[in-house]
């Protein structure tokens, strides 16, 4: 089973990064844009009455989705309660008639709001422990024939950090996610990509990770010697033109609830 045990630590890291996330999360923003394009491809231009977003965070996907589709009602979920007001403001500005916020770990929220026309999630599901259980809950929440569209990360994500023992998730493979999804949905599209960012130094890499909250693992403090070893080895092993690399492995998936 993949995922993470200490959700409180994950929430605290994202809470600290809430203000810096929109500017720093360049890969996650690109993922959100691609996901909206995929939803448009499979859903067309139909009006979406009720939408549920899992792990809405600062609202990167929220805003792009609400700008692209007419939506009557939005339920936004996040582990971090402080996300409520920024998300409410996005909904107000884009004239969404109904907005509600579902605070907490989506795996502990019980039955999800029903009669949804779309369920979406961007860069969140890698933190969850039981995708099979979540997918079953999402299927029950959707109107038959409607879509569940999400992004996550797959094996090899932030491989530089993992190789140096800097902490990281045990990511599911794309094949594993497809197999779990197929138990509950019709699989419309599943793909992955590789995105490499370049930073001037390993120190900048760590700053980027901190500003996006994705260092939600590993609560221990590093000693000075471990920190210096990390910097030296990162510079030596992951040097590219213009600096050092950090590699993301995004995954994109669109599913449809089968008709009754």
From Swiss-Prot:
It catalyses: malonyl-[ACP] + S-adenosyl-L-methionine = malonyl-[ACP] methyl ester + S-adenosyl-L-homocysteine. It holds the Pfam family Methyltransf_11. It is an enzyme of class 2 (transferase). Keywords: Biotin biosynthesis, Methyltransferase, S-adenosyl-L-methionine, Transferase. The keyword S-adenosyl-L-methionine applies. CDD domains: AdoMet_MTases. Its EC number is 2.1.1.197. It comes from the Bacteria. GO terms for molecular function: carboxyl-O-methyltransferase activity; malonyl-CoA methyltransferase activity; S-adenosylmethionine-dependent methyltransferase activity. Pathway: Cofactor biosynthesis; biotin biosynthesis. GO terms for biological process: biotin biosynthetic process; methylation. InterPro entries: BioC (IPR011814), Methyltransf_11 (IPR013216), SAM-dependent_MTases_sf (IPR029063). NCBIfam families: BioC. Converts the free carboxyl group of a malonyl-thioester to its methyl ester by transfer of a methyl group from S-adenosyl-L-methionine (SAM). It allows to synthesize pimeloyl-ACP via the fatty acid synthetic pathway. Belongs to the methyltransferase superfamily. This is Malonyl-[acyl-carrier protein] O-methyltransferase. The gene is bioC.
């Amino acid at each position: 089973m993949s995922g993470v045990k200490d959700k409180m630590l994950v929430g605290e890291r994202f809470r600290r990064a809430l203000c810096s996330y929109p500017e720093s999360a360049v890969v996650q923003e690109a993922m959100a844009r691609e996901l909206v394009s995929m939803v448009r491809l499979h859903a067309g231009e139909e009006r979406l009455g009720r939408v549920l977003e899992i792990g809405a965070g600062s609202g990167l996907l929220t805003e792009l989705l609400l700008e692209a589709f007419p939506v009557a009602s939005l339920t936004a979920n996040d582990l971090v309660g402080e996300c409520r007001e920024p998300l409410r403001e996005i909904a107000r500005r884009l004239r969404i008639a109904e907005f509600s916020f579902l605070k907490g770990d989506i795996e502990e929220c019980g039955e999800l709001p029903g009669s949804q026309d779309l369920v979406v999630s961007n860069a969140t599901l890698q933190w969850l422990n039981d995708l099979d259980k979540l997918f079953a809950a999402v299927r029950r929440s959707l109107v038959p024939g409607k879509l569940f569209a999400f992004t996550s990360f797959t094996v090899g994500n932030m491989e530089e950090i993992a190789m140096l023992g800097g902490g990281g998730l045990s990511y599911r493979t794309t094949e594993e996610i497809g197999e779990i999804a197929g138990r509950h949905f019709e699989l419309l599209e599943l793909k992955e990509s590789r995105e490499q960012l370049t930073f001037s130094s390993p120190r900048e890499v760590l700053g980027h990770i901190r500003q996006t909250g994705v260092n939600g693992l590993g609560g221990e403090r590093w000693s000075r010697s471990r920190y210096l070893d990390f910097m030296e080895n990162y510079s030596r092993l992951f040097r590219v033109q213009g600096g050092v690399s950090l590699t993301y492995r995004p995954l994109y998936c669109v599913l449809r609830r089968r008709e009754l």
